[in-house]
A protein has these predicted regions:
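Short catalytic/metal-binding and nucleic-acid-binding patches
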Residues: 1-204
Length: 204
């Protein structure tokens, strides 16, 4: 079974022999950067012209179809999502900063050095949909047709604000008293501690 390390910080996975691995198993190392540019939003149901540039920060939000609780936390799903996120990030050289998965949506803040954000989002959500449907024993679409939000973050203050918003989402929604009490994926602890999250390819 392949495995990889996902560091919830400014990260990348170096491709072996200069190539992007399809199923990577190398170590993700830390990296810092700053992105600039106007805020944008992308609706998955409408094809809108948008400018994709390298060296940009983004916040990604996507909701489940009909806001169903298909991302509800349990050990199997948490491991599944972390692995899919790590694989997609390595494939498109996206630097994952923080991800918080609620029961019917996720918020993920990333840094895109190469302008691969669209391909990353498509690949990530396809992987998560296939694996989650297999886990849940369902065949219908997982994601809402209208709910891919991709917001470019202009400066470090914007990045910090979105990190706080994403990390504290379970508390804001009144589900837990403290961030660390949320049983779902929330990589704030790894970001603050600077440690890697070990992920292993699930059977799904």
């Amino acid at each position: 079974r392949g495995s990889l390390r996902l560091l919830s910080g400014f990260v990348r996975n170096p491709a072996k022999n200069g190539r992007r691995p399809d199923i990577p198993d190398s170590t993700i190392v830390s990296r810092r950067g700053v992105g600039v540019g106007p805020a944008i939003a992308h609706n998955a149901s409408v094809s809108l012209p948008r400018q994709i540039l390298p060296n940009q920060f983004y916040m990604i939000t996507r909701r489940c179809t009909q806001r169903m609780m298909l991302l509800r936390p349990d050990a199997e799903f948490n491991a599944l999502f972390e692995y899919c996120l790590a694989v997609a990030a390595a494939r498109y050289e996206i630097l994952v900063i923080l991800s918080c998965v609620m029961s019917n949506h996720h918020h993920t803040v990333v840094f895109d050095p190469h302008g691969n954000i669209s391909e990353f989002c498509e690949y990530l959500h396809r992987l998560v949909a296939k694996a989650t449907n297999a886990l849940r024993g369902r065949r219908e679409n997982l994601w809402s047709s209208e709910a891919l939000s991709l917001v470019r973050l202009v400066d470090p203050e914007d990045v910090l604000a979105k990190l706080v918003y994403a990390a504290t989402n379970p508390v804001k929604d009144g589900l837990v008293a403290k961030v660390e009490d949320w049983p779902g994926v929330n990589t704030l602890g790894a970001l603050l501690d600077g440690h890697a999250i070990e992920t292993t390819r699930p059977k799904y």
